[in-house]
Structure formats: structure tokens, C-alpha cells
Amino acid sequence: MTIDPNNQTVLRIAMLRDHFIQHDRFTPLEELFSRLAEKRLADIQTGRVNEAHGLALSGPSGAGKSAAIAHLLKTERARLDDEGYGDATIISLRVPSPATLKFVGQTLLRALGYQISSERQAWYIWDLVRHHLRERRVMFVHLDEAQDLASRGTKHELNSVASMLKTLMTDDEWPVGIILSGTEELEDILNHDPQLARRMKTVHFESLSPAAHANDVLDLLESYCERAELIPAPQLLSLEHGERLIHAAANQFGLVIELILEAIEEAFLQKDTALSCKHFRRAYQLRTSCEDEFNPFIIPDFYRIDARQVFTRGGRRS
């Protein structure tokens, strides 16, 4: 049977995406969560009921938060399962829209495998949430895109959700740790409620700096080339290319990885054995539909380009 080259490329890229490359910013996130988990396990093993604590990860869109959290939770879930605590110790979900107290509760119940009528009142839904968290012995609940908890913009709704999160963490029978990840607006939610903030450890993913992080990005590029079995062209390993790549990714770590993978995909599709600048040029063009004069992998003065813009053309500048 003949294998479709496009399907083969998709599979190879999927395997590369599944591979998580450890980076400096991941280490404090991993260490903080490990401490929280060990404290929670110690309480369970000794039969003590202490309030749980949580972890909040903030950063700009494209900073790589989702990939870091997904890898962290996958690893910790497997570890806890191996130690006999089951495979449902950590529940992860994306904050729904609208992020009302009732809708968040319903979404969490569904993640716990329980369906409920939308006619039920919020207090009843959250009583069920606490019951099922306890019955399934869930240790942590992760809410991704947690900045949306404040999307309705009303203090009342924000206060209600923050209060319920604190209630989960201080439950007198089965306290549950809360993990929040989201954009920098998440910080406003924590600062709005000091009681919630004091129960959270915090990590922030900063934007990259071309001057400070170009070499790190080149190391990352080499690592992906090795896994993809591609030879990096000499010009790709220059400091200038590292700076171009960071700028093209709007200074965001997660977008750097996306661009690298998209360039590798172009090399696979063209059946090239080496990764070169032409693949990055094409990847950026496909991502933004920009003309050559607005492609940071082509022009000399690439810093003048606003890499957050798409459809950039000579007669249509932002």
C-alpha cells in the first residue's frame, strides 16, 4: 500500500509536537507544582485535613503556557497513577464562555463525568462538584484560559467564582488544589482577591529578548533538527537568524516552536534533507499572507516589521 506523502508529513510533525523540550522557564513551574503535590500527598497519607494551595501561570499569548502545563499535568498524572492514586487525580478543563459561576460548575461536572440539567441552580451544581471531587479523590483542578473568569467584567461574578475556588481549596473534608493558567489578565483576578492570591504560588513566562535569548533559540532549533533528521543549513545557526526567528514569533517562546515546526514541515513536503532559510520564509508567508517586503526572514531591516500583523501588503500597512 502506498503511503500518502502528505499524511506521512502530518504524522512526523505530530510526533515532533508531542515531544516536549525542557526549557529554563519550565523548571520553576515543575518545582513549585511538585512541592504542592508532595504536601497534598503527605496530608492524605497522615489523614490530616489542611487547606490546599494552588499555582498560577501567567504570560502573553503564544508564550508556551499551554504546552508547559499540558506536559506538567501529563507527567504528574502518570506519576500519581503509578503510585496508586488513580488516573483522575488531576482534572483539567478550559474555562467556558460565558464564565459564570453556574457554567463553570457545569463544565467541571462534565469533566468529572457527570451530566446535569442546565435548570439546576449554581449552589446545587457546586455542591455536586465538591461531592464528586471528594468521591473521585481529585487532588487538583486546572483551569486553562483562566483570565476569562473575569470576562463578564462584573465584580459580582468575579467575586462569586473566586469565592467558590477558595471554598474548594478549604473544604473541610477534601480540599482541592487549584491550578490557573492564562494571559496576564489572570494577574488582575488574583490581585482582586488577596485571600485567593495568598493561597497561590505564581510563575510568569516573560517574552523573549532577541539579544538575550537568540543562542537559546538556536539550541532549540538544533534539537528539533536532530529529532527531525534534518541538517540545519549553516546560516540557520547564526546569531542573526536566532534574532530573526524571535522577532518573527513576536518574542513568544511558543510561537518560536510553531515557526520551527512549520519550517520543518515545509522541508518534509519538499523532500529536502536540510532545513534552510527558504523553509522559514515560506512558513512565515503561509502564516501571515505577507508580501516579501514584510517577511522578517527576507529583508535586512526585519525589526521594522510588526510580526503580530497578518495580510501585510505594500498598499495596506497597519
Residue ranges and their predicted role:
Residues 1-53:
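Walker A/P-loop-proximal flanking segment of P-loop NTPase domains
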Residues 57:
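Hydrophobic anchor at the beta1->P-loop junction of P-loop NTPases
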Residues 74-85, 113-116:
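Post-Walker A helix-loop "phosphate-sensing" segment adjacent to the P-loop in P-loop NTPases
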Residues 2-5, 100-104, 114-164, 168-175, ...:
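Mid-core helix/loop region of P-loop NTP-binding domains shared across ATPases and GTPases
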